[in-house]
């Protein structure tokens, strides 16, 4: 099972390649590249550790008996599996604890930030749709049976009513999906606070018993007073771009990937930078002036550095985050090129090879373990 070790080693090679390639790409493409690389490599790491732990568990007598496996054959086929499992098992437990800690911390920070904001008006769009589960038979299209003329005979209407019910349910589903695909109006929350801060607060998904909430742009009165009118427009466009692009999902993926493999931690800072550059470019296009956007970024960062709002979550996007001088310099230059340099094609090919090899090695290791289990089950000494 040599293939199972490949996804654990390739991140040390792929991460520098991804960072090098991202520098030559436009901000949006760079953010997708870094987030995708982190996701693929973290998934391969998790699968490899799981396969190593599973291979060792299969050699435990109770597990072998439960799976009708020949324990002597398994021991001879993979003598080092228990040692690898003894290492992979605790590592998986630590990674699970880190993932829970990261998710819990993010949840508590977002909940505290939402609690500190004024109540947002409810989103009425879903109320215009038919209630899910309503019986369409209650909305009859024909006259009520009590109002029909006497002596008139009617065929059995149950098949027709079932067809109408299915058609209306299909229309309700299509309307719901259309609504979800439409851009959500992000609400603005202005806090009466002298401390200057502004950030994009992610919304909450709709769950049973709880209505969802759209994302909100949070800005303090201190931040608004620190900027001019055009600069305020650029700041709000920047934060709106974070919400529209779901940049909080990118940040969460990078944070969890860094918990799974130490080599993936260097991807967090460049991903945060390219997400801010992505929002900078959207804001510059929205206000139509790159210099105004650059001034807004610089002044917002200067104002927020004095006394930021204490309830701002750590894993949220903000206009004053990241290497601000570098972002301002990029905004004061022409629009970035959308084509990477020719000399970086080799870097792109090498990174693609690393990601493809990670995926192929994970699939091969999984198939290898499956073949081992099947062979152990068909051995003459396997319990029946």
Give the label of every model feature segment.
Residues 7, 11, 15-16, 88-105, ...:
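Cytosolic-facing loops and C-terminal tails of multi-pass membrane proteins
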Residues 1, 5, 34-41, 84-92:
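Alpha-helical transmembrane segments of integral membrane proteins
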Residues 1-34:
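Membrane-anchoring/interfacial helices and their immediately flanking loops
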Residues 7-10, 20, 37, 54, ...:
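Alpha-helical membrane segments of multi-pass proteins
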């Amino acid at each position: 099972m040599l293939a199972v070790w490949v996804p654990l080693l390739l991140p040390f090679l792929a991460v520098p390649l991804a960072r090098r390639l991202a520098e030559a790409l436009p901000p949006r493409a760079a953010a997708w590249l870094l987030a995708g690389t982190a996701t693929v490599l973290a998934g391969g790491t998790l699968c490899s550790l799981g396969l190593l732990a599973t291979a060792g568990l299969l050699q435990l007598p109770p597990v072998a008996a439960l799976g009708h496996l020949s324990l002597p054959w398994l021991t001879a086929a993979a003598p080092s599996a228990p040692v690898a499992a003894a290492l992979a098992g605790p590592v998986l437990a630590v990674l699970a604890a880190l993932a829970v800690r990261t998710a819990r911390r993010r949840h508590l920070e977002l909940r505290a930030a939402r609690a500190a904001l004024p109540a947002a008006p409810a989103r009425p769009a879903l109320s215009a749709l038919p209630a899910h589960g309503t019986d369409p038979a209650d909305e009859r299209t024909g006259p009520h049976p009590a109002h029909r003329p006497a002596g008139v005979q009617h065929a059995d209407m149950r098949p027709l009513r079932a067809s109408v019910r299915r058609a209306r349910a299909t229309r309700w589903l299509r309307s719901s999906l259309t609504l979800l695909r439409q851009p959500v109006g992000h609400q603005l929350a202005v806090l009466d606070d002298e401390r200057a801060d502004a950030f994009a607060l992610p919304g909450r998904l709709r769950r049973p018993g709880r209505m969802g909430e759209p994302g909100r742009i949070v800005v303090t009165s201190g931040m608004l007073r620190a900027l001019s009118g055009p600069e305020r427009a650029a700041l709000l466009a920047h934060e709106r771009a974070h919400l529209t692009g779901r940049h909080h999902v990118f940040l969460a993926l990078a944070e969890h990937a860094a918990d799974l493999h130490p080599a993936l931690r260097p991807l967090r800072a460049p991903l945060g930078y390219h997400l801010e550059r992505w929002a900078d470019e959207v804001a510059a296009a929205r206000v139509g002036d790159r210099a105004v956007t650059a001034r807004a970024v610089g002044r917002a960062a200067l104002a927020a550095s004095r006394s930021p709002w204490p309830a701002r979550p750590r894993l949220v996007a903000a206009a004053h985050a990241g290497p601000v001088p570098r972002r301002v310099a990029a905004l004061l230059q022409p629009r970035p090129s959308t084509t990477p340099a020719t000399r970086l094609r080799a870097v792109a090919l090498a990174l693609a090879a690393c990601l493809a090899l990670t995926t192929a090695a994970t699939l091969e290791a999984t198939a290898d373990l499956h073949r081992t289990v099947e062979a152990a089950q068909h051995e003459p000494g396997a319990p029946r």
